[in-house]
Amino acid sequence: MLCAVYKSRKKAETYLFVERREDFSRVPEVLMSTFGRPELVLMTKLDPAKPLGIASTSRVIEALGSQGFYLQVPPPPENLLEQHKAQLKVSR
C-alpha cells in the first residue's frame, strides 16, 4: 500500500498518513485545523514486514483502510525525576 506522510507545522513530531497525496477528504476538519498546513515529508510503500519509526505498520495500514488516515503523535515526555526516584528506591 502506497501512502503520503505529512508533518505538522504546528505540532512538533506529529505526522499524518493519508492514502493519496494531497487527499485530506477523509480527515476531520477539526483535526486539520489543529494539525495546520501539512508539509509533505515522503511517499512510501507500507510493508508490514518493514517497521516504521514509532507507529506499527500494520496499525497504519488498518487505519488507512478503515478511516482514510492515521495520526502519529510523539510519545509522552519522559519524567526523569520519577525515574530517578524509582532508581533510588531500588538501590536501597
UniProtKB/Swiss-Prot annotation:
Record HAMAP family: UPF0745
Q: Which domain of life is it from?
A: Bacteria
Return the InterPro entries for the record: YcgL-like_sf, YcgL_dom
What residue stretches are annotated with the YcgL domain? 1-85
Q: Which Gene3D superfamilies match?
A: YcgL domain (3.10.510.20)
Q: What is this protein called?
A: YcgL domain-containing protein ASA_2166
Origin species: Aeromonas salmonicida (strain A449)
